[in-house]
């Protein structure tokens, strides 16, 4: 594609030059003809850009070799922004717009492109494990050539401004000054990376030098941009084309300054606040530093989160980030919870030997059994932190055994909750009983600690000793409240299940009547009681023998169903008679829908009768037993 475009441009240029020479027959008149023709100048400009592009490809092959995909992508992104800024610069210097002006801006964009490629290649140098001598020759030669060109063009613009006054060379001088700072920063990075590659161990101070280099270069760029904007605003107009690069320069300088301040603070905290890792801690944890992937023998630091790293690796890491490399904990915050990387033997004994700051009163069990916060265990170098937010009422579910073991040390085994004002814990939403299995043995928690029978006999000192004022006591109260809430929720769910089960058993406790027409003794009570179809079958099959006999004859009208047919023989006075009420036995779904109200009333009366009979039978049994 590139070869085709180059061939087309070359053919058009040859045609334009040949046509001009054919018209004028002399060199000078032909040149004048081409310069006066806009179409001819357009073709010449295109050919000039093609030549510059091909020359750039040649220099890229010489100094850089094959470009990587990331380098080419970043080059295109920056080039389009630079081209837009160049078009804005044309509007400021529209009076000076001529072929020489276009050529100068083309050369500027050409040099900017190679500055960007050199910067990308030096950054890649830090990530590449093996670099040959050809790489160093290419990068060193490119940096040298670019530095010389920037300096020469800067001096030329400076001299031109002194001789001719403020012209367009002022803009080019400023641009080449910025490019000179860029090439200086790139050269310093290259020297630092090359020096580190010559050593077997990582260079500890390289990150510090890089950080301060970015800070100084950023400061110089900010000063240059501010001076250029002030000068251009006084002489020409406000230079809109430098606002975008000036904004990014100020932002990068601010970031570099913030990195310097934060890194110094982090390193100071590391040297003063964080203890050195002991050999025992190194043995109990994974003694491989995840930054350099080497074993940690000595000179290691333990962060507040419990992770251990080399001191030199942490110093280099803190130059860029002020967080733990493993868990991303912000190490600049003041540590509030003392954590350990792995639980050690003897911690429980030390915690049990800790005394209670509140003196025990006479006749009261000492409250020294209240343990301090247990050390947080971290598995595989990761910290499992459980922060109790008293203000928000949020806490992790506690262990019942640990809770009641801690509370046993207080008088009567229960801390007093009086005077503690905390928001209620979040209420667990009630779950439908049909969505939970019928077995709930695993939901039943341990019983709460025993409650003192009479609190009025306790003195003020005893009550204060029971209540407690330390963080441990508050945490235990919150845990106890959460356990109570869990037990209440479990009780509510169990009661819902019991109610639904008892209602179902009342429906299935009735013995089915004799089958109609000698049918098999299949029971309809095994079906769910909530099904409308099952209810219809239940009412159809629960008719008395009299009703069954009447239903056997299809030509006979519907018989009357009385309470005697349901089995009433002793308590007729308690049940209102239904001898005068005629109820049709449904033979289809339509008949059942028409007589649903009568069947429902009949069913209610029958259930009431069964309840009364069961009560009387139970009373007779108790009387007989007495």
Curated annotation (Swiss-Prot):
Chain ranges passing through the membrane: 39-59, 97-117, 129-149, 168-188, 223-243
Cytoplasmic side stretches: 60-96, 150-167, 244-626
Pfam families, A to Z: zf-RING_2 (PF13639)
Residue intervals of every RING-type zinc finger in the record: 289-328
Residues on Lumenal side: 16-38, 118-128, 189-222
GO cellular component, one term: endoplasmic reticulum
A GO term, aspect molecular function: p53 binding
Signal sequence interval, chain numbering: 1-15
Catalytic activity: S-ubiquitinyl-[E2 ubiquitin-conjugating enzyme]-L-cysteine + [acceptor protein]-L-lysine = [E2 ubiquitin-conjugating enzyme]-L-cysteine + N(6)-ubiquitinyl-[acceptor protein]-L-lysine
Enzyme class: transferase
Polar residues composition-biased segments: 577-587
Keyword Isomerase: no
Primary location recorded for the protein, binned into one broad class: endoplasmic reticulum
Region (Disordered), start-end ranges: 569-600
Gene3D superfamilies: Zinc/RING finger domain, C3HC4 (zinc finger)
GO BP term, example: ERAD pathway
Domain notes from UniProt: The RING-type zinc finger is required for E3 ligase activity.
Self-association and partners: Homodimer. Interacts with p53. May interact with Septin2.
Family, similarity comment: Belongs to the HRD1 family.
Name of protein: E3 ubiquitin-protein ligase HRD1
UniProt source species: Drosophila melanogaster (Fruit fly)
Gene for this chain: sip3
């Amino acid at each position: 594609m590139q070869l085709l475009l180059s061939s087309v441009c070359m053919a058009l240029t040859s045609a334009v030059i040949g046509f001009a020479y054919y018209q004028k027959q002399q060199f000078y008149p032909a040149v004048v003809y081409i310069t006066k023709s806009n179409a001819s100048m357009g073709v010449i400009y295109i050919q000039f850009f093609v030549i510059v592009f091909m020359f750039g490809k040649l220099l890229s092959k010489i100094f850089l070799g094959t470009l990587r995909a990331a380098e080419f992508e970043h080059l295109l992104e920056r080039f389009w922004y630079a081209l837009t800024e160049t078009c804005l610069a044309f509007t400021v210097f529209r009076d000076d717009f001529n072929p020489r002006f276009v050529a100068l801006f083309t050369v500027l964009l050409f040099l900017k492109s190679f500055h960007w490629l050199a910067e990308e290649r030096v950054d890649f140098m830090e990530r590449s494990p093996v670099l040959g001598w050809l790489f160093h020759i290419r990068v060193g030669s490119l940096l040298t050539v670019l530095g010389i060109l920037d300096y020469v063009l800067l001096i030329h613009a400076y001299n031109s401004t002194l001789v001719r006054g403020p012209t367009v060379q002022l803009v080019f001088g400023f641009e080449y000054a910025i490019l000179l700072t860029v090439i200086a920063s790139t050269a310093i990075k290259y020297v630092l990376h090359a020096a580190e590659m010559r050593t077997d161990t990582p260079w500890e101070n390289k990150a510090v030098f890089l950080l301060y280099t970015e800070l100084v270069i950023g400061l110089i760029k900010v000063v240059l941009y501010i001076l250029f904007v002030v000068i251009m605003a006084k002489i020409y107009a406000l230079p809109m084309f430098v606002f975008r690069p000036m904004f990014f320069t100020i932002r990068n300088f601010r970031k570099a300054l913030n990195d310097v301040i934060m890194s110094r603070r982090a390193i100071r905290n590391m040297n003063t606040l964080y203890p050195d890792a002991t050999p025992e801690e190194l043995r109990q944890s994974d003694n491989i530093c995840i930054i350099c992937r080497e074993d940690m023998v000595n000179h290691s630091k333990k962060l507040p989160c419990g992770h251990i790293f080399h001191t030199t690796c942490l110093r280099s890491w803190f130059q860029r980030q002020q967080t733990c490399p493993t868990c991303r904990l912000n190490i600049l915050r003041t540590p509030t919870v003392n954590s350990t990387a792995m639980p050690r033997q003897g911690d429980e004994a030390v915690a049990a030997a800790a005394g209670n700051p509140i003196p025990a009163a006479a006749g009261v069990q000492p409250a020294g059994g209240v343990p301090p916060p247990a050390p947080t265990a971290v598995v595989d170098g990761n910290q499992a932190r459980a922060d109790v937010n008293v203000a928000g009422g949020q806490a992790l579910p506690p262990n019942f055994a640990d809770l009641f073991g801690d509370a046993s040390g207080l008088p009567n085994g229960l801390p007093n909750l009086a005077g503690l004002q905390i928001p209620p814990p979040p209420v667990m939403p009630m779950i439908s009983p049909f969505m939970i299995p019928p077995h709930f043995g695993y939901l039943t928690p341990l019983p709460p600690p025993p409650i003192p029978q009479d609190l009025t006999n306790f003195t003020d000192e005893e009550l204060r000793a029971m209540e407690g004022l330390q963080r441990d006591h508050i945490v235990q109260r919150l845990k106890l409240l959460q356990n109570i809430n869990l037990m209440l929720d479990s009780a509510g769910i169990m009661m819902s299940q019991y109610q639904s089960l008892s209602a179902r058993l009342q429906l299935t406790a009735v013995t089915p009547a004799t089958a109609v027409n000698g049918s098999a003794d299949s029971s309809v009570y095994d079906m769910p009681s909530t099904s409308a179809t099952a209810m219809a079958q239940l009412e159809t099959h629960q008719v008395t023998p009299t009703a069954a006999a009447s239903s056997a004859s299809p030509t006979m009208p519907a018989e009357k169903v009385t309470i005697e047919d349901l089995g009433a023989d002793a308590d007729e006075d308690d049940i209102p008679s239904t001898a005068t009420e005629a109820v049709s036995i449904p033979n289809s779904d339509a008949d059942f829908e028409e007589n649903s109200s009568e069947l429902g009333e009949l069913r209610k009366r029958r259930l009431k009768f069964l309840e009364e009979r069961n009560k009387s039978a139970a009373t007779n049994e108790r009387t007989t037993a007495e």
